[in-house]
């Protein structure tokens, strides 16, 4: 029989690593509570049509990377490759953005893309999503950027990340620019890399995002998207930059930043780092003001961003910003297996009365000698002994494991007071 192993591109979070996730998730919740965003929990499976209509048929994600399948009813379903589309579907289906309502939401969970696995890029990956609906003005643009900035400051990594900004303008602006870009690239068709040639027919703007040096040299003299953007949108983008200056948020303009999802409009941004090699983007987002009505809802202003949690953890680890793991328990009980009905009741009462304590014991209940060895290995500060003699006398034995002191005795009815000290 063949050995069962994990699916390629998927990862187990082992017990020794789970504290890293708990640390990061606690910081995420701290920041989002500060900005009064509400958590939502979304299904990992959606109808395939949702992503075709939102992310885009021609996008790399939909055309090459989604996990698609049919259920027993013949419905075409997809493991979610990103979270925004599902969040918009939820908002529409539950009438959360009608009649001028506003929503500030966040979620965190696994996403799935069939990509070549490498460090920081996996086929199942966890993503934090932050989404806001019903806000038209610049203030919400600044707030979502400030949320990411605040998280990076809370984690102690703000000096190692860079905010990159661009504006994609309106859909009409992009159509006009796309025609100008195609016209410019015509003479260079044979010199473009293979992926860029494919994008000429499907999604020409994505050529701007090419990492191939030769293609980037060709693009150096290409028309600039900013020159095709309406005056009002250009002014809004300029004002956004001015406000970021006032807030003290460092940024740089990136004219080639276009994002890989078709639903973005207006402002787009990424937070990047030079500490993770080719997987430099750790946060990306922007406005998607047309997506809600494209999916059947009322026209609703919308903006959001996503953070790759694994990449963020890799960065924290690389920079030494993760706390040391503390698996040590506070109290280790050493019990007589012949008297468990009494001693376990005492232990459980203490757990209920002092829930902040980490309490452990040897559930195999070997000899006292073997239990003391396990107590020493547990890292506990104190061992509490409850054997037949202790039960007969009404006193628990107390041994401070990290100090060279004689064993003490404490009456059972004083144990809670003793442990609270």
UniProtKB/Swiss-Prot annotation:
Keywords: Aminoacyl-tRNA synthetase, ATP-binding, Cytoplasm, Ligase, Nucleotide-binding, Protein biosynthesis. One of its GO terms (molecular function) is histidine-tRNA ligase activity. Its main location: cytoplasm. GO terms for biological process: histidyl-tRNA aminoacylation. SUPFAM superfamilies: Class II aaRS ABD-related, Class II aaRS and biotin synthetases. One of its GO terms (cellular component) is cytoplasm. Pfam families: HGTP_anticodon, tRNA-synt_His. It is an enzyme of class 6 (ligase). It catalyses: tRNA(His) + L-histidine + ATP = L-histidyl-tRNA(His) + AMP + diphosphate + H(+). The keyword Protein biosynthesis applies. InterPro entries: aa-tRNA-synth_II, aa-tRNA-synth_II/BPL/LPL, Anticodon-bd, Anticodon-bd_dom_sf, His-tRNA-ligase, HisRS-like_core, HisRS/HisZ. Its EC number is 6.1.1.21. It is found in: Cytoplasm. Belongs to the class-II aminoacyl-tRNA synthetase family. Homodimer. This is Histidine--tRNA ligase. It comes from Francisella tularensis subsp. holarctica (strain LVS). The lineage of its organism: Bacteria, Pseudomonadati, Pseudomonadota, Gammaproteobacteria, Thiotrichales. The gene is hisS.
